[in-house]
Regions:
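A short, Lys/Arg-rich alpha-helix, primarily the initiator
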Residues: 1-17
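DNA major-groove recognition helix of helix-turn-helix/homeodomain DNA-binding modules
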Residues: 45-69
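Helix-turn-helix repeat elements of alpha-solenoid scaffolds
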Residues: 86-98, 125-138, 167-178, 207-217, ...
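Short alpha-helical DNA-recognition segment
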Residues: 17-36
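Amphipathic alpha-helical segments of tetratricopeptide repeats
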Residues: 100-104, 137-144, 177-187, 217-224, ...
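Residue register of alpha-helical TPR repeats
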Residues: 114, 154, 194, 232-234, ...
Length: 420
């Protein structure tokens, strides 16, 4: 992409409109001045640029050519035009390498930093967390060098998100902690609020429930009840109490939230009833648990189909816990169909593991082997080597019990190859 100097723009525009230098003459603009500007012997002044732009527009009108031009275009340097071009490109959904090439050529630091940040967003959306992290880090280095500190909290937040989504929760906490400190320093309350939620979530993931609960309380100070994240934070709070066995407190939180949602088919109500179903199940209250799951199922079937698989697969445990395996299997399979439709990897895995446990309980070896192979494919697709190793070991033991030495050996070899 070539960007023209002011002198080149005048010359190229004049030729395009089939004008001679004398056609641009005016009371205060001589042909000699035009010639000197076109040969870079004189700089283009603003008052001259205004007059030339008017001449060009007038000629374009005579030729019936749609032609947008003004003095700002004529006065801009190649670097300024390059910056405008790159900014427009960065607004698009596709971020290509041409942008960084132009930014490097003209040393456009703001464009470079923005390019790497957008590239990070693109990699993050594609779940390429390592490359997303690298690009956010590149962006942050440029902003730091350029003393543009206001964006730093956001970039540390994004770097933490990369680590958290890659299940590296301790690493994520390091970046989230830095993000929180910078967000306070630069009075970025929006990022400060966001990062507190994710800090709490990471603490829960690594079983530090007391720290998670303390962080949630800090987060709730920033929240208002019209914000969905107010509910998400309370969901997280309830889940922490569930994890430490305080089921009644967890139930009380959900019941309180339920009263704050007036719409009978709010998707958040589906989540609340689903989790109440899980809590009552953990307490051994199968009747109330089933009632809650059925309410959640009705809501999600109407307004939140992408999460319907969660309710179905969680609901199946009401039946498997009471050894009603036929009904449990039927419900799990319905959940798996929904999970497949909405590409829900977590619940595809969860549902198949539920089937695995049932088939183990009823000693259905044929179906047990089938579901193990399904799980293996899911784990391979997501590079989950640690669980895959355990699964291959389980399969090899099943084959050994059947005296199928070759199949058992094949599973052990597959397990070994994961680490080669």
């Amino acid at each position: 992409m070539k960007f023209l100097t002011p002198s080149e723009k005048i010359k190229e525009t004049r030729k395009f409109l089939k004008m001679k230098q004398e056609d641009l003459q005016d009371e205060n603009v001589s042909r000699g001045l035009i010639s000197m500007i076109e040969t870079d012997q004189r700089a283009l002044a603003k008052n001259v640029a205004i007059k030339l732009a008017e001449k060009f527009k007038q000629k374009a009108k005579e030729l019936d050519i749609k032609f947008e031009i003004d003095e700002n275009f004529l006065l801009r340097s190649p670097a300024e035009d390059a910056e405008l071009y790159c900014l427009k490109k960065l607004e698009g959904s596709i971020i290509n390498e041409e942008i960084i090439e132009i930014a490097c050529k003209f040393n456009l630091l703001e464009i470079k930093a923005s390019f790497y940040s957008k590239k990070g967003d693109s990699f993050l959306a594609r779940k390429d967390y390592d490359n997303a992290f690298i690009n956010y880090n590149n962006s942050m280095s440029i902003y730091n060098d350029n003393k543009q500190h206001e964006i730093i909290p956001h970039l540390y937040f994004q770097m933490g998100i990369c680590k958290a989504r890659d299940y590296k929760y301790n690493d994520a906490l390091l970046y989230f902690d830095i993000c929180e400190r910078y967000s306070v320093m630069y009075k970025d309350t929006k990022t400060q609020k966001l990062v507190l939620y994710d800090i709490a979530l990471c603490y829960k993931k690594i079983d530090k429930f007391d720290l998670a609960l303390k962080t949630i309380q800090k987060y709730l100070l920033f929240s208002n009840k019209k914000d969905n994240f107010y509910f998400y934070a309370n969901f997280l709070k309830s889940n922490c109490y569930k994890a430490i066995g305080k089921y009644d407190i967890a139930i009380e939180i959900y019941n309180s939230l339920r009263a704050e949602l007036p719409k009978p088919e709010d998707p958040l109500l589906g989540y609340i009833y689903n989790n109440l179903g899980v809590l009552y199940l953990d307490k051994g209250d199968f009747k109330t648990s089933l009632e809650c799951f059925e309410r959640a199922e009705k809501i999600r079937d109407a307004v939140d189909k992408n999460n319907l698989c969660h309710t179905l697969i969680d609901k199946s445990k009401v039946f498997s816990s009471q050894h009603f395996y036929v009904e449990a299997i039927k419900i799990i399979n319905l959940g798996l169909i929904s999970a497949e439709t909405y590409k829900d990897y977590e619940y595809l895995l969860k549902g198949n593991y539920s089937l695995l446990r049932i088939y183990e309980s009823i000693d259905d070896i044929s179906n047990l082997k089938k579901v193990c192979l399904v799980i293996a494919d899911l784990l391979k697709d997501n590079n989950n080597f640690s669980e895959l190793t355990l699964l291959y070991t389980k399969l090899s033991l099943i084959y050994l019990n059947e005296n199928d030495i070759e199949k058992a050996k094949e599973c052990l070899i597959l397990s070994q190859k994961l680490y080669e």
